[in-house]
Structures are given as C-alpha cells and as structure tokens.
Amino acid sequence: LTSVPEETGSPEEQAPPLPRLQLRDPLPPVIDTVDDYVAYCARLALGHGPVALDAERASGYRYSQRAYLVQVRRDGSGTGLVDPIAFDDLVDLDEAIGDAEWILHAATQDLPCLAEVGLHPTALFDTELAGRLLNLPRVGLASLSWSTTSG
C-alpha cells in the first residue's frame, strides 16, 4: 500500500486570490434624455479605437428579446449607458460609432436586438468566438476575463 499525502488547507485556502475589481471611471447615469443622448453621441464620435458594446435584455421578465439597456465604451469617450426605450431609435449612436470595430461577447445574442434599434456593425470582434478559436476550455465572459488578466 502507498499512502496518499494529506491535503492541507481548504480549497479556498489553496485557490489563488481573486483580482480586486475596480471601475475605471465612476458609474455614469443612464442616458434617457435627448440632451444627454446628443452629448454622449458627440463624445463617442470624438473617441478613438474600437467600441465595446453590450445589450441587456429582459428575457427573463418579458417575452421579447428587445434591448432595455445598451452599454457602450470607447477610449476617449468614456462609458455610456443608453436607455433605448427612451428614444425612437439609436441611429445617431450608430453614426457616432461610424466604421469603428465593435467588440462584443456572444455577438449572436446581441446583434438582433441592436439591429432592432438601428445599430449595425461594419466590423466585429466577438470575444466568445475568439475563445472558441483558441480552443479555451471556458468561453464565458468571466472566464475569458480571468484567463486574460490573471496570467
């Protein structure tokens, strides 16, 4: 018989510490007035580089896949939390983005509801698809974020 070494400490003690998450900027208010929307679109147009987007749907509470919040981030323009329900469409936001590359996670989930409000990418980078192409074992946003920042 061989002996199995006894484990010391609980799994929590053996796991590496989780990174401390901090917002880069203060949490912005939700954009739900025309004046705030126009001002954010102007800032977004002056930004540079790709644009990160995310749509929040209320599919657990509603029968539609409509976007109820659109989150936007671009270097030089900050974060925008746009309430698409407050506006007829988000065509001005689409024009402010122009031909900048979009960065989404699980793009197939968000593209239909973003198109419904007038947002259409000309170039797209999907972080979930990138994780699959890299043959990563987990491609959820949290797992990808952890694997790319903990290294």
Language model features by range: what are they?
Residues 48-53, 57-64, 81, 87-88:
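An N-terminal domain-cap segment
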Residues 1-51, 55:
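N-terminal accessory regions of nucleic-acid-interacting proteins
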Residues 40-46, 59-64, 71-72:
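Short secondary-structure boundary/capping segments within folded domains
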Residues 18-30, 68-151:
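Active-site-proximal helix-loop-helix substrate-binding element of RNase H-like nuclease domains
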